[in-house]
């Protein structure tokens, strides 16, 4: 404690009390304070000073816990205002003081002055002058200090200040509340809005006692998300500080004790509240971490309203500099190159609910485990009979839902992988099986953390670690927050509802059951299925959701190379290209949704048929890739021609199974040409856009899968290398990419540039137009240009009809067409060409009804009479329909046949 002695003017005069200095740490009451010195390598010494010659009211005191019958003592009138007067004036300020008297018990009484010397404000006089304290009776009246106190008291009485005002001062007595009946409700009632408070006591660096205003709740607040070293209570009642506990406590005390603060109440733990303390000079939670006085704690970091990442970053700052509690910190060794730590890969398979198999750019496969999460598992009453074979996917509650969530989100998609840690291999023990080395990573797609999404749906739980274990997800706090939301909302594993049960019949190899199922599957035609496993290029295990069964499925119509087999006493080697065929089938259909046509079954209970994915026949694809040959049984199938064509092309290339093929000379046969009458050749199309002049744009259904694949690859490429906003300068006629209102990128062509804010674009694959700012445009990557795949939207007009020139009538016709065919599949036949676009007839895919004829029947359009001989039959049908509409006075004809006199006025011609 700093001090300075002031000597008297002459050696014979009375001794002048020594003037000492200190910083006010705490105000105990209206007449007592605690001062401290400057810190020197640790918390400084402290000293209690009681003001001489005055008395202030006693503050409230809670009954001792050891006296259950004891009663709480309330504030005396004006006691709290006196304390507040001193607190606001003195806390954290430098004062000087003189000691006038010291009792045998060690209590020190003296005078306190604000500032560095006794010329400063006399605190006792200020209290008395404000009517917040009284002069003690019985003191010597001729003492100058007493005289000044007496004068101050008389002035306060005259001015009716403080306790000399009218009334008994009951309004200054606080209604202190020491306990809260329902802490959770109390926290929620404040809706995380800052609450004014005074910090009354600091237990350790991260736990304080606070007086909440204006309700005067005296509560214990633990700082959310962190923990400082504490003081361990020994059996003899003494306290032993952990390393840096005293320093952390002083750090918090010197900044917050008896300061006005705001507290955001975030949660509760027993009777203690969790919160964040806000002070004008900063956030104590983050400061403690940054200075190495605290560490993050997982159990409460999720409720920290300002973002757990800020706390983790502050902790990292202290760790990297080995500050205080981190002085012995050793960072985990990084044994991965950057290219191995972060990469983009394609998801090929989902393993249960916490791991995936990905294909790297090098072509290698790698198993990735999702960091810090645990898939659903059997617990308690759910543990099954040991004699029954466990099928985890179907028997563990929510395992199937978790796997399906990942499968639908990820299979065939490119994801971003960030390796968080590598879990070393562990040997088996009596209770735990052996584990090989695991690569644990955070996997994201479209900016979404897959592990976090799983946890938020209650389909996985978060692993709890030791506090010093850094081997965890780089987004661990987000996982904890997601789990808290899932628990609160009762999602998945946290639901109180009955767990879903999946009764899946496995009829693989069960001949009797297979015979029972065969007629149903044959009658069903194409059935939906999920490929669960690929045994070889042509042998798969399928899950049929509608029938809730598992079957073994053999591809019909082909001979696929056999793989290696384990036979009794020997291993039979696989045929050439068997592994390539298996890999091809795996990459194409494993865990994909497919359609199957069951034709028959073999004697082992395996079903035989055709498998289609995205409109492609897997048997044909294997033959195309020269990984299979056509089997003679295909002759009686509807797919024989495409199989033969695919095989012939593969033979010509002399690849793989046809590498040694020698073409046999064939006898040339002259084709006989037959004259046939003209017949309409309708092809399936998908209508994407209807224009205001009743033209429409369609996509060819046969090339639809190519467009889907191109769009998927293009968007993955754009998400990996997004265009720099505003870097693209659009030019008329140029192909580009444009971000539509749905937030997705599409191929487009620039039609007109009014300004950078108004660029007219045409979506070349869908036929719609839009005006966009150039910031929503980008350069079309060459890999997705129209050379790779031509524009998929083709413009057509209806043949044999005239579009109304009247705007209202034309709108009626357009609205009708939009309702009937937009975004639907139809059948299209080109009838004749024109300067603008081909004119066609369009049929509904299901009913085969003529769309244009329907418009005529409804009286929405008129017939365009053409003279060509081949059209006379259809023109007659259209004219008959028009006469029926006229007779019924429908739409255009509601006022009769208007064409006789004013056809020109309305823009019609007969």
From Swiss-Prot:
Recorded GO MF terms: endonuclease activity, active with either ribo- or deoxyribonucleic acids and producing 3'-phosphomonoesters; RISC complex binding; RNA binding; RNA endonuclease activity
Motif window: Nuclear localization signal: 321-325, 388-392
Residues of the TNase-like domain: 18-166, 193-328, 341-496, 525-660
Pfam families the record matches: SNase (PF00565), TUDOR (PF00567)
GO terms for cellular component: cytoplasm; cytosol; dense body; melanosome; mitochondrion; nucleus; RNAi effector complex
Record-level GO BP terms: miRNA catabolic process; regulation of cell cycle process; regulatory ncRNA-mediated gene silencing
Record's protein name: Staphylococcal nuclease domain-containing protein 1
Organism: Mus musculus (Mouse)
Tudor domain residues: 729-787
Task performed by this protein: Endonuclease that mediates miRNA decay of both protein-free and AGO2-loaded miRNAs. As part of its function in miRNA decay, regulates mRNAs involved in G1-to-S phase transition. Functions as a bridging factor between STAT6 and the basal transcription factor. Plays a role in PIM1 regulation of MYB activity. Functions as a transcriptional coactivator for STAT5.
Mitochondrion keyword on record: no
Catalysed reactions listed for this entry: Endonucleolytic cleavage to nucleoside 3'-phosphates and 3'-phosphooligonucleotide end-products
